[in-house]
């Protein structure tokens, strides 16, 4: 017995096939990102915060592996790790997606093993977790952070690195003052987010000397930032001031817990 299938059958079949593939592709998405922080949810799961190239800041639920093979996978969840992963959309009533198939797309060579670099990474992961919390897709910002973390891994002179990254993130977020408008003797008014000629009447400002150093550093890049002369004390004060600046301009930005550790390193 011979069956003849009509052209309409094939049209309907291939339409169904395309729709099925499209639905599956929506269920699981491949993406690249930078791991910011991990919070233990319970014995089986953790909440993983990633700043991704396509989605911006996203929180995922991640099921922890319990065998020896999976332990290596869990070890990927380190601050600033540049990852590639698959994710599934959030279930109804939840805004947390499911994370799967995570891998390290560019393994670090020095950051996990150098105590100073590791401390910087821990601080910056906490800083970025709060600074980027409401940030959607922002490819220029993603590329900046991605390039900066790669640079740190191979760098030898990086004492101003954490300050410069905080400045660059602020530029992308539109809150950092324009250093080209700085003039000798100006103050940085942190409330207004601009350099001003007169000392502000409130206390949220940076003095003339450090305003000059901040403007100088803001005009540099990775390969020239070490040309900005900063003493250990100035570096510590600027770190505190930049944290205060973010607390003023980013809603719910807290006093960072890891700032004390970083201060000790650069004293």
Model-flagged regions — what are they?
Residues 21-46, 51-267:
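Non-catalytic alpha-helical scaffolds and adjoining flexible linkers that form interface surfaces
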Residues 4-5, 9-10, 14-17:
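Short hydrophobic targeting helices and cationic amphipathic motifs
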């Amino acid at each position: 017995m011979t069956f003849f299938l009509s052209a309409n059958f094939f049209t309907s079949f291939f339409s169904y096939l395309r729709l099925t593939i499209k639905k599956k592709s929506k269920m699981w998405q491949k993406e690249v990102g930078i791991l910011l922080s991990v919070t233990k949810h319970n014995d089986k799961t953790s909440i993983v915060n990633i700043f991704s190239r396509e989605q911006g800041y996203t929180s995922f639920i991640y099921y922890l592996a319990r065998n020896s093979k999976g332990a290596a996978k869990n070890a990927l969840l380190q601050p600033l790790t540049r990852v590639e992963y698959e994710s599934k959309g959030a279930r109804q009533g939840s805004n947390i997606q499911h994370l799967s198939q995570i891998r390290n797309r560019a393994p670090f060579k020095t950051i996990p093993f150098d105590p100073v670099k590791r401390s910087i990474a821990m601080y910056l992961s906490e800083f970025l977790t709060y600074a980027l919390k409401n940030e959607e897709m922002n490819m220029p910002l993603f590329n900046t952070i991605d390039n900066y973390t790669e640079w740190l891994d191979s760098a030898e002179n990086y004492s101003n690195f954490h300050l410069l990254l905080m400045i660059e993130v602020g530029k992308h977020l539109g809150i950092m003052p324009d250093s080209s408008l700085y003039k000798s003797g100006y103050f940085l008014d942190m409330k207004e987010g601009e350099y001003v000629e007169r000392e502000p009447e409130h206390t949220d400002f940076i003095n003339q000397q450090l305003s000059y150093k901040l403007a100088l550093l803001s005009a540099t890049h990775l390969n020239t930032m070490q040309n900005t002369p900063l003493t250990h004390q100035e570096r510590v004060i600027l770190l505190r001031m930049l944290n205060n600046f973010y607390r003023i301009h980013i809603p719910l930005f807290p006093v960072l817990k890891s700032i004390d550790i970083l201060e000790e390193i650069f004293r």
